[in-house]
Amino acid sequence: MNGSGGRQMQCGKKADDKSLLARFFHADRSLTAVASELDSFDGRAEPDRCTRLVSKLRLNQDKVLAITNLIMEELLGEDRDPRAFRAKFPEEVLQENLAGQLWFGAECLAAGSSIMNREAESKEMRPLAQAVTKSLGNVRVLLRDQCLRNNVPNSKTLQLDLNDSTTEQLYESLKIFDRLFAEFELSYVSAMVQVKSRHEYEMQQWIGVLFSETLQRALKIGLLDQDMVDAFDPGLMFSIPRLAIVAGLVVYAKGPLNMDMPGDQLSEMFRPFRTILIKIRDLLRNLNHEELYQLEKVLCTNEDINAKAPLGSSSIEAPSPEHSSHHPTTSSNNNNNNGDTTGTTNTHRTVERLVDQRNNNNNNNTSSAPALDKAANRSPSMLSLSPNSTPTASPAPSPTPSHSIASTSSSATGSTHPPADWSDGDDEDEEDDDDDIEVEEEELDSTDDETDEEQLLKDIVAADCASGYLIPNTNLGNLLQPQEVPLTDNFVASEDDEYGAGEQQRQRHRDGQEDEPSTSAAMLAASRTLQRLRLPSSDAEPLAEQSTIKTPEQEQDQPHQSVYRHRHSHRHHHRHHHHHHQRHHHHQHQQPPQPHPHRTTRSGRKRCSLDSTESEATQPERDREPSQASGDTSAASSLSDDVSLAMRNTTARLKFKSTENLLHRLFVCIAGVADQLQTNFASDLRQILRSVFLMNMSSAQEEIDIPEKTKESELFEFRASENDVIQESAGSNQSIYSAEEVNPELDNVFSAGSGGGSPGNGNQANASAQRHSAGGSIQRNNTVDDGSPTGGGALLATSRSHVMRSRSLGDQESASTSTSSSQLHQEQQQLQIQVQRQRNNSVGSNTPSSASSTSSSSEQNSPVSARSGSRRRLQSNNETQMPSSATVTTTATATLAPPAWIPDGKAPRCMSCQTPFTAFRRRHHCRNCGGVFCGVCSNASAPLPKYGLTKAVRVCRECYVREVRSGMSVQGVPSVQERLTATAS
């Protein structure tokens, strides 16, 4: 007992012992003292004292665990439990005091406490927490015993007795504690923050690929600029996620944003928004090329939607020239005159107006059956209308009805590429049909033009279109449902549901009762179905024919083909409806129509392969019809499913009364989802965007910006010659110049100063000589006249050379930025003393205070001293003040480069109080020295004119005290005697 107490006293006396065991002994004793004090009083009675002691307890726990970790590194070595799971942790979790937080959490859980809102996880971790605290207590006892047995003062390594049983017991106890502590770390951190799985990491990589592909596509179509990527434009952090949502839903539909996959397979970043993304996808599929481009442009620029901008009429892009060249009807139709094209264009507007008029009449319950029958007799496009039709929206009547019905109907017929078997030998009917519809248009134009234009203007300036884009406190799901449509998770129906819907659809056709909007929905449905035939597989067509997005130049190459396909598909849509309603209204033909057995099974067009379409395009149509009839019959049910889905998507678009309203809602929802990623997944988004920027930078920029910035002393450094060494009052650290200082062509400041100092005869030769000669600028006995222009130039050259030397040598002499800043201050103070000595010993100066009026530093630019000095010069020697004032003005604008900031990763603790940084104790940089400090040690602010910072900025306390003192002594603050002298004069 006495021996043990003696060893404890002996170990306790040597507090300066730096060995691991001694350091552990003192840290453990301090921790025990704090814990005992905490247990000695009621924390509820003295909350302030309790809080202070708890903070001290956690600091001591950090210290004990840090030393224990060093001991385990030396004793266990490779036997330590692996901690590869830390790669899953977010950046903000991996702090230096993580071990102390884990120990504190384990003690709280072992005592019966629970993590807030994590009761289930706390209950599961409680046995493990109890095992951790018990194992750690055993390790502490064994380490204290080893401190008293085998401690070697100031030993760099542990020198334990390997033959002792206690050493082996310590070894096994450390292994058990290391394993338990690693398990508890993974469990505790996983309960507190989201930890990624392997699948999540893979999905995050796919999200990065999607972002990169989106950026490349945006650069290709002109939405973004390469200079923005090279400059790391902050605006891209918002633009790229928004564009990625659009591209992932409609362009790269089979990528990581494939909404058809199960929800648990989506990335955790987009999993909370799955329902709203499905609705966004369905609406995006109804946009044509121009509308999609306009939406993406708005997502990049946040500009208002241009209501008068021409919107495209096709949601399905025109086929490529190679594909369309196989159709003889298309090539022959390209030779038509402009009158035929004009007639087809008029057909568009006629159908749009009739459909829009039908919807408005049905919505107001004022339409009558005779009126509908009359309209049906006039135009085949109205044969599918019936009093039982129930529209889902009431768009305003207009030539382009607020872009809702017009865009829908024209999108269905604009540039749809029909299969080859759609040419039924009825080309001769088309001219008669066009003439009949043109008559209808002429009758409507005379009465509706003025009313339509006024209504269109009202729709454009509607409140919901002109409102701002940022809508706070908005449910994103409700934004996409302007009508009474419930929001459900089962927005996309399954295959069985779609099949059942198709059967009901066909039954309603047979019964003559149609509930869906007939004309516009059916027209769009068939064209949507045909477009899906062209998109899914890359083996059937070239990539250019599959893409849902093409440049406007590609679509403008084939105007006549698009016009023909518009009219041709329009005829077949009408005949399709005529057949189901048993209303065949044929016009007069030049020859009897050919029989069409395949018309009864027109829904089977989906199964026709594209290869056979191209090969059969050159064959006569009559030879092709019988062979396709059987194939059409076998695939009739498949097309009905797609038709029902397309009609449902079209119905969703019809709920918006204008295209501007639809684009506005899409903007709000897409921007809302993308901006939520900035908040909820900031760390993941930063990593993804950083990778995307690095992958898509230009090669020249990559070579310049990726390497770390090199110090000026490393870039411009050479050995000085004998002429460059200062003769008097100079140290060895002032014998090296920078390359910029030696090169006279780069010395713009000096040239301006010498020119300003001598407006009559600027002596450039003397200025250059004084820049490179030490004797002419700094020697003590050299005489410089106040009125001489070379005197001002010499002082300016002296100031500049000292500033540049201090700047280049400050980084070279010390590794710490704060040390270089203090050396810079000392250099400037020595410069002021030398200038004052030079001015006092000069012949032309009669007053010792003249130096205050010709300061060569921006810190001496005091209005009071300059005014008093100029008055004294006028009274003493009546000399001009222009050289001196020019020198002051010139040097006042010459500022230093701000110091380089110490990286956050190299400063785990405050450089003043040595307090470790945490997620709550943030880092702050001093603008004067570049050091990293906590908020308490850097709560001062002061202007730094030497760096060009005239406003107060954050500085540490040491720099603040130094700047205030130097400002009082260097900046020329007048004394009481000087103020009295200036007042008397």
From Swiss-Prot:
Chain intervals with Basic residues compositional bias: 563-589, 596-607
Tagged with keyword Phosphoprotein: yes
Zinc finger (FYVE-type) stretch: 904-964
One annotated GO molecular function: zinc ion binding
Residues where Zn(2+) 2 binds: 926, 929, 956, 959
The name this protein goes by in its record: Lateral signaling target protein 2 homolog
Matches recorded under InterPro entries: FYVE_LST2, LST-2, Znf_FYVE, Znf_FYVE-rel, Znf_FYVE_PHD, Znf_RING/FYVE/PHD
Annotated organism of origin: Drosophila ananassae
Biased composition (Polar residues): 776-785, 875-885
Low complexity composition bias: residue spans: 327-348, 384-393, 401-422, 629-640, 761-770, 812-866
Bias type Acidic residues, positions: 423-453
Family affiliation: Belongs to the lst-2 family.
Residue numbers of Phosphoserine PTMs: 537-538, 808
SUPFAM superfamilies membership: FYVE/PHD zinc finger
Top-level taxon: Eukaryota
Region (Disordered): 310-453, 498-520, 533-640, 747-892
Annotated positions binding Zn(2+) 1: 910, 913, 934, 937
The protein's role, per its UniProt record: Negative regulator of epidermal growth factor receptor (EGFR) signaling.
A Gene Ontology cellular-component term: early endosome membrane
